[in-house]
Each structure stands twice: as structure tokens, then as C-alpha cells.
């Protein structure tokens, strides 16, 4: 008995962001969602953390990824990466010396090293 593609169940997909790199080929993806509070009916922000298999080690911290449900890969991993939706914006750290920092930071001026303002004569009426 073979099943046609129309009868086959589709797998669940979720979109979330990479919150942790927990080892080789393993990441944690946080999927945010909103749900109403059962008593007060206020919309509450919640999140689910999924353990995801990253075969190529291509996802970085902060990336937005699409994950799909799959067979169990390990004790906790039941999801795998389908695609990276958006890369995280990263800034490269630049080494600077203390003299560069001192030149850019303004210094405090005190009354002892600033000249006194000149007095203006009062206008005559």
C-alpha cells in the first residue's frame, strides 16, 4: 500500500532565532509566540526552545532560521534546519589603544583652568 504525495502528512515548520550553539552540529532555536492568559485574557509573550540539528554548522548566534520536524537525532533533537531566513548583523571588533580612546573621550573642564567670562557693560537707557 503506497501513499500518494497528496495523502502524506506535511511536517511542521517553525521560524525562530538561534539562541545558543551547544556543540558540534547542534543549536538551540527560540521560537516566540503569543497566547492569551487563561484567566485575564491578556495576550502574553511566550517562547519555546527547540534543540535543532545543524548538519553544515552554518547557523550563527542571532540568525533567523526555519526549522522542520524530523526523526529523532538524539535524546532531545527532533528538528533540523531547512534554511537561514536572515543572517544576524555582526560588528567586527577593532583593536584600539588607550591613547586613541583618550583622544576621543572629552575631558572635564574645571573652573581653575578655564578663563573667566568677560563682563558686559550694562546698556544705558
UniProtKB/Swiss-Prot annotation:
It comes from the Bacteria. GO terms for molecular function: rRNA binding; structural constituent of ribosome. One of its GO terms (cellular component) is cytosolic small ribosomal subunit. Residues 1-21, 101-125 are annotated as: Disordered. The keyword Protein transport does not apply. Keywords: Ribonucleoprotein, Ribosomal protein, RNA-binding, rRNA-binding. GO terms for biological process: translation. The keyword Ribonucleoprotein applies. Belongs to the universal ribosomal protein uS17 family. One of the primary rRNA binding proteins, it binds specifically to the 5'-end of 16S ribosomal RNA. Part of the 30S ribosomal subunit. This is Small ribosomal subunit protein uS17. The gene is rpsQ.
